[in-house]
Amino acid sequence: MAKDIKFSEDARRAMLRGVDQLANAVKVTLGPKGRNVVLEKKFGSPLITNDGVTIAKEIELEDPFENMGAKLVSEVASKTNDVAGDGTTTATVLAQAMIQEGLKNVTAGANPVGVRRGIEKAVATAIEELKAISKPIESKESIAQVAAISSGDEEVGKLIAEAMERVGNDGVITIEESKGFATELDVVEGMQFDRGYTSPYMVTDSDKMEAVLEKPYILITDKKINNIQEILPVLEQVVQQGRPMLIIAEDVEGEAQATLVLNKLRGTFNVVAVKAPGFGDRRKAMLEDIAILTGGQVITEDLGLELKTATVDQLGTANKVVVTKDDTTIVEGAGDSTQISARVNQIRAQMEETTSEFDREKLQERLAKLAGGVAVVKVGAATETELKERKLRIEDALNSTRAAVEEGIVAGGGTALVSIYNKVAALEAEGDVETGINIVLRSLEEPVRQIAHNAGLEGSVIVERLKHEAVGVGFNAANGEWVNMIDAGIVDPTKVTRSALQNASSVAALLLTTEAVVADKPDENGPAAVPDMGMGGMGGMM
């Protein structure tokens, strides 16, 4: 296919048009008085959102050169979303400001490579300063404030703070759609996995159809149990202790299952069998997790262990186990806290190394089950359109809160970026490197300018006053007052602000140093006509 090539000024101008179209659509959502954007969906009702990355991903431009510019900025939003989970609109605003200022200077004769060095130098200093002014997040109130600012809803803030308090910072918090109107929180404490009892005759509460075992022994194996003789020795030891038993195995079937059910119904002993969670290597890892949590051993041939020689000492224990037809919950496993901590650190290290998003998600789930529990935020709304919009906002708020716990918080509303202005301005440089630093300085003002603009005010006036205010004092666009941002609960996670600045500068520097752009040439003749299949003379067929 023939290619269309544009060089230097033409290339950069075409890409800038794309950057502007995407950024202008995204930046109207910034701040407490930001507006929504409606996205057409081929099926179903349109999506109404103020989430920057969702809008950016939907934009596809007709001109291939403009589209390349738009896609570059869309990547800024996506990358910021991947790393920090929020701040995508801020990242887009920063990228647009840097690209616009940079192109003005490059067009006027500045060397793009020198400008790039200046941008990198300024951003490195800005990030150091952000870390220096960052405050750790400690109280439940602070967590609620971060979530409320991100979602624009105080109730959501309280809900997420409650969830994080209940399951801990490492706990899994999932967001699901509710069937009702209310948004509520459901917390599962302890380790839960999605496998239920192998026979309904094992239940202890026939009304709720669940089996509740108090202080049970837990046999963990990756083998299939067909013959009761295999587990008879350990079963007899448990019966002598007069305690219930949970068996986690690949499967329990045939004669073994029948014998267990029969003895359960006769009241000889209380035992429940469940299938092991997961598949393949992941199953082995999850069984090992359960063993560490309950202080037991996995009876597996990999370790040279056999079921018929297993003893009570190799079994795990827990305060309580609840088994339903769909899942099993182990509450307060009796494992050694040092071993559990070591396992948690091992899983964390695996999360850092893995490149697969799916694997990372599964590792995060395992981490949560060991470290805390699982909280489910059930999102309710009156209509499907409102439900989708609300769910997106709550996801952003959750990501924002996690980022705040990780790296702390800075003053919100773009205030932190302006407060580091003087430190960046103090950098010594000359020529094109100085030009690069000035480009970053101009972009640091842009989020405040845009927040003020969206609130119907003159951004430049707000920025100038902000530069002369005391550190931490900023403009609250929600009510038009000048307040101490952190005291007023208007905060941004440091990680979100840092990621936005890093990703914006990275793409801006790349675009400024672009000298040629290659795109497919559109086919001027349009698609070829369908050829005549020579069946014109067959009209007499019935």
Swiss-Prot record:
Keyword Repeat: no
Ligand binding (ATP): T29, L30, G31, P32, D86, G87, T88, T89, T90, G413, N476, A477, A478, D492
Catalytic activity reported: ATP + H2O + a folded polypeptide = ADP + phosphate + an unfolded polypeptide
The entry's keywords: ATP-binding, Chaperone, Cytoplasm, Isomerase, Nucleotide-binding
Intrachain disulfide bonds: none
Keyword Phosphoprotein: no
GO CC terms: GroEL-GroES complex
Record localization: Cytoplasm
Known EC number: 5.6.1.7
Region (Disordered): 522-542
GO MF annotations in UniProt: ATP binding; ATP-dependent protein folding chaperone; isomerase activity; unfolded protein binding
Alphabetical list of InterPro entries matching this protein: Chaperonin_Cpn60_CS (IPR018370), Cpn60/GroEL (IPR001844), Cpn60/GroEL/TCP-1 (IPR002423), GroEL-like_apical_dom_sf (IPR027409), GROEL-like_equatorial_sf (IPR027413), TCP-1-like_intermed_sf (IPR027410)
Swiss-Prot/TrEMBL GO biological process terms: chaperone cofactor-dependent protein refolding; protein refolding; response to heat
Signal peptide, first to last residue: none
Quaternary state and interactors: Forms a cylinder of 14 subunits composed of two heptameric rings stacked back-to-back. Interacts with the co-chaperonin GroES.
Family: Belongs to the chaperonin (HSP60) family.
HAMAP family xrefs: CH60
Role summary: Together with its co-chaperonin GroES, plays an essential role in assisting protein folding. The GroEL-GroES system forms a nano-cage that allows encapsulation of the non-native substrate proteins and provides a physical environment optimized to promote and accelerate protein folding.
Record's protein name: Chaperonin GroEL
Species this protein is from: Listeria monocytogenes serovar 1/2a (strain ATCC BAA-679 / EGD-e)
Lineage: Bacteria, Bacillati, Bacillota, Bacilli, Bacillales
Gene: groEL
